[in-house]
Amino acid sequence: MIEIYYFSGTGNSLHVARQLAKRLPEAELIPIARFGRREAITSTADAVGLVVPIHALGLPWPVKRFLERASFKPGSYKFAVTTRECFQTVFTTMDKLLPRGERFHACFAFEMPVTYVPVFEVYSEDERARVEREMLDHVDRIATIVSRRAVHRPKDHPGWFVLSHMIYPLVRRWFQLVRFPNMERSFYANDSCTGCGTCAQVCLANKIVMRGGRPAWQPNVRCAYCLACFHYCPSHAIQISGRNTTRRGRYHHPSVSAADIAAQKRRA
């Protein structure tokens, strides 16, 4: 039995997890967002995988919290897939969140279409098609390695040592203390909002609630920074103040619906 845990705001990681599960017949997909804040998480599977995005060069905080509280079968085969290139320090961080003596046997990172619109523009249709083709090749290779329970731990390029061990921690800390908190207070819905409630449905942190037919971001609930609300809004009404998002495109994986994203929060 293989359990694949995933976290996905705009569908990239869910799509990759689905493709991987197709190639691993014994695989079961389990959403990380399903688990409550204080819920104990126990797995008895012989193999466990994670398919997750990268936020601010590192793990999304819900994924980190999941690993801190999860209890996997001792000696089980563990693998991780990130849907964005990252430093190998991300995977060593994941190792440290496991019980002493445990580590991820195989780790993989590759690019899916970018979704962090405060910095990047969304990919063109041609770019998305290219990335999709490359993703399928990556998943074929990953499935082969996982099926064999092989060890696969790539190393950073030697020239990246300073970036990964000195610059990365500083940038990550800045995002945590400054960039994300400021952005969290900057979400709003413009006059294009129809009050459909999609944003609240896909919000993986349950931060968004509908009040008087308009979305409201609860200040006492921590944002997951998944941008599902932004990318799935059918009227493109969700904006981020000061981030020039009125001119940015929207993207979610075409095979993943808003209902699929919202379903991650559904309890088993």
Task: Locate predicted features.
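Amphipathic alpha-helical segments
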Residues: 20-21, 227
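Short beta-edge strand/loop motif at the mouth of beta-sheet-based domains
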Residues: 37-39
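Short secondary-structure transition/capping segments
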Residues: 41-42, 117-120, 213-214, 253-254
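Short low-complexity, flexible loop/linker segments enriched in glycine and/or proline
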Residues: 121-122, 223-225, 254-258
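A mid-sequence, solvent-exposed acidic-amphipathic segment
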Residues: 162-201
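Long, positively charged, glycine-interspersed low-complexity recognition regions
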Residues: 236-268
